[in-house]
Amino acid sequence: MADSENAPLIWLIAGEPSGDLIGARLIAALRERTGGRLRIAGIGGEAMAAEGLESLFPISDIAVMGLVEIIPRIPLIKRRMRETIARIRQDRPDIVVSIDVPGFCYDVWKGLRSDDIPLVHYVAPTVWAWRPDRAKKFAAELDHLM
């Protein structure tokens, strides 16, 4: 996890396989750009683990789609949200970068809003016709959307 005691700490959240791959590429690019002077923490899968991330918990805990699949997992997902917020507050990263999974991350963003930690979301979420307010809702919680 740590390449240097005083190196910037970047906290990443990826909650499904495609986000894990994007996160792994992001870690590699950041490591190259900083000459390896970088610390990484967060939530990710096998690809991010290959880049040195020790995930707070398995992404399979939050990588759930479909109403029938989500309903029985709500208590676990809510617990993982609380654990994520608590760990980020404990770690005091220089930035939090969420990758995809806006449903999980939205509550994390809201929970961290008063903590003065920059929040960036990588991979802009789709704004559907039946949820046109989604972009405004996300913009209110984030510092930057890529």
Regions found by a protein language model. Give the residues of each.
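Extreme N-terminus of proteins, especially the signal/transit-peptide cleavage junction
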Residues: 1-8
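Active-site and donor-binding regions of nucleotide-sugar-utilizing enzymes
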Residues: 8-146
